[in-house]
Amino acid sequence: MHAAGSSAAQAEMPRLRPELDRTDLVRRAQLGSVAAFEQLVLVVAPSVHRYLALRLRNDSEARDALQETLLAAWQGLPSLKQADKFLPWVLGIATHKAVDARRGRVRTSDADVELQGREDESAGEIRQAILTLPASFRDVLLLRYVLQLSEDEVAEALGVRRGTVKSRTSRARKALGERLR
């Protein structure tokens, strides 16, 4: 019974190989499966929301941009060529939606910065310093270190070459270090 029970339990646990599962979900969603896309949303939405919240500094705008991102992802899904690149592709869409959102608002002051959760003073200083960086530096740092994407995934999300990601990361870290001195 143990052998049969454990193999049945393993058959019911689809998350044994998450990357393969995600790729399979993308392929099924590309064929029109709403259920598969909903599962993808459950997997990627927290990371995309976190990125947008950090980028936009406003949770309400981040939620709106997340919805626009997911709608655009659903509509553009048939054009995605590599199913295993879904997250970087969605983050690329999110980057464009964040730019659109920032263009559409009038910035009143830095007092509207919304920080999620409790942070100690040094983490708050680091976050504030990151937010003062140019967008190209800030995006690379957020994607690379907060969302822990590889250099290749960051490059794909931002639509730039890997070498550009490396140089921006280096320059961003240097600029961040100068701001924190």
Stretch-by-stretch model annotation:
Residues 15, 30-39, 49-68, 162:
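Short, charged helix-capping/linker segments at alpha-helix termini
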Residues 45, 49, 70, 134, ...:
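C-terminal flanking helix
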Residues 5-10, 15-22, 100, 105-130, ...:
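Internal acidic/polar
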Residues 75-85, 92-112, 119:
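Arg/Lys-rich amphipathic alpha helix in sigma70-family domain 2
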